[in-house]
UniProtKB/Swiss-Prot annotation:
GO cellular component annotations of the record: cytoplasm
Enzymatic reactions: N-terminal L-glutamyl-[protein] + L-leucyl-tRNA(Leu) = N-terminal L-leucyl-L-glutamyl-[protein] + tRNA(Leu) + H(+); N-terminal L-aspartyl-[protein] + L-leucyl-tRNA(Leu) = N-terminal L-leucyl-L-aspartyl-[protein] + tRNA(Leu) + H(+)
Protein's recorded name: Aspartate/glutamate leucyltransferase
Domain of life the protein comes from: Bacteria
Role according to the record: Functions in the N-end rule pathway of protein degradation where it conjugates Leu from its aminoacyl-tRNA to the N-termini of proteins containing an N-terminal aspartate or glutamate.
E.C. code: 2.3.2.29
PANTHER family, sorted: ARGININE-TRNA-PROTEIN TRANSFERASE 1, ARGINYL-TRNA--PROTEIN TRANSFERASE 1
GN (gene name): bpt
Location, primary (coarse class): cytoplasm
Record bears the keyword Ribosomal protein: no
């Protein structure tokens, strides 16, 4: 499949075969994938985000299932975002943390935290057997401008800070894309997933970026429903972005 244009300008898309859905065990899924060999992929990626695509490793994809449209791309309009009471409490609860933006490079401490997170939060989910190679292949693109937003508890009396969480974040001219967040399960009560998104919103605001892309909200899926708590929120219907409440009303 190709979006029209001459040979140099056309954008090639591939449709995958059916594969087990990563969200619903009783469903199959398929995706549209931008040509992974296209040398322009890094430049096309910001536009692809605005078309509802997402990155995993070096692949840029969008669900394209024959009998299910539950996955809805959502983004936060940074200038209009206002935290609710629960989100303000989460920010206050984590005021003691340091937030650092670091290069997206594989490190032993990062992988150790990632492995602990998967083992405790997603046991038997198909990812808990990831090794260092899978960690790097899944989260770090060879062409993407990716950063790790590290959340750390400061050390005292000469002790080093403690890594509590990492938000893998792509930086583009259209906004930030929240690729994946993992954290220390011993500190789950802090709400580090929520705190990470709040910090990504502030990061985008500082950089003058208009949106934070959260990936897919999935209708009826409990683990993905948290994304609707960030308001205002915009949803992509395959043609344009509109207010998320229109999606809830059945659009």
């Amino acid at each position: 499949m190709a979006i029209h244009g001459d040979r140099d300008d056309e954008l090639r898309l591939f449709q995958t075969g059916e594969h087990p859905c990563g969200y619903w065990s009783d469903r199959v899924a398929r995706d549209l994938v931008l040509d992974p060999h296209d040398r322009r992929l890094g430049g096309l990626y910001p536009l692809a985000l605005s078309w509802g695509f997402r990155r995993s490793g070096d692949l840029v994809y969008r669900p394209h299932c024959a009998h299910c449209q539950a996955c809805v791309a959502v983004r936060i309009p940074v200038a209009r975002f206002a935290p609710d009471r629960s989100q303000r409490r989460c920010a206050a609860r984590n005021e003691d943390l340091e937030v650092r933006i670091t290069a997206a490079t594989a490190r032993d401490d990062l992988f150790a935290l990632y492995h602990r997170y998967l083992t405790h939060r997603h046991a038997n989910g198909g990812m808990d057997d990831h090794g260092p190679h899978e960690f790097e292949q899944f989260l770090i693109g060879s062409w993407s401008h990716t950063r790790f937003m590290e959340m750390r508890l400061p050390g005292h009396d000469g002790q080093p800070s403690q890594l509590l969480g990492v938000a893998v974040t792509d930086v583009t001219e259209h906004g930030l894309s929240a690729v994946y967040t993992f954290f220390d399960p011993d500190h789950a009560a802090r709400g580090l997933g929520t705190f990470a998104i709040l910090q990504q919103i502030e990061w985008a605001r500082r950089e003058g970026l208009p949106h934070v892309y959260l990936g897919y909200w999935i209708r009826g899926h409990q683990k993905m429903d948290y994304k609707r708590r960030y308001r205002p929120l915009e949803a992509y219907d395959g043609r344009r972005w509109h207010d998320f409440d229109d999606e809830l009303d059945g659009r």
